[in-house]
Amino acid sequence: MTDQLEMIDIHAHILPGIDDGARNWEETGRLLEAAWAQGVRHIIATPHFSRKTDMEQLRQLKAGVRELAHRKGLELEISLGQELRYFEELPLYLEQGRALTLAESRYALVEFKPGDGFQTIRRQSGNWSSTDLFPYWLTQSGIFAFVKQAGPRSWFRAEPVCRSMQKA
């Protein structure tokens, strides 16, 4: 049994040269090493969604990141997803595979506007049946707030962001 908690990072901008994540392969390597040192054993690369995204390019970059981790001796599982800013057609994009869920699961990382309250989120996502949502907000203090449970007794839980990955 290990003394260290093994974690899954479900929101990582580790693909080099994509959006606001790692700028190059060297930076990606440093992020992988920092994640490994903190007990992360599975990283879901989540570049920002765009209607113009080249899915094949994302898959090739994911394969490259997996190979880089292997060369560094890091037994990291690397999966693909997307950070999805809510828009009306998003459920259709998910159903058609034009937007990615987290690691090909039924879960999606969906961002709503900071001012959107729970009722707005519930109204916008209420029809989704095949995909569960992880709506979140990034606060100025670096805290993600995820909707933990839907329904009248819903509550929000704050999760600290992997701080050393922010600094890397």
Q: Across the structure, where does each feature detected by a protein language model lie?
A:
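Active-site neighborhood of phospho(di)ester-bond hydrolases with catalytic His/Asp-centered motifs
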Residues: 8-10, 43-47, 79-83, 138-139, ...
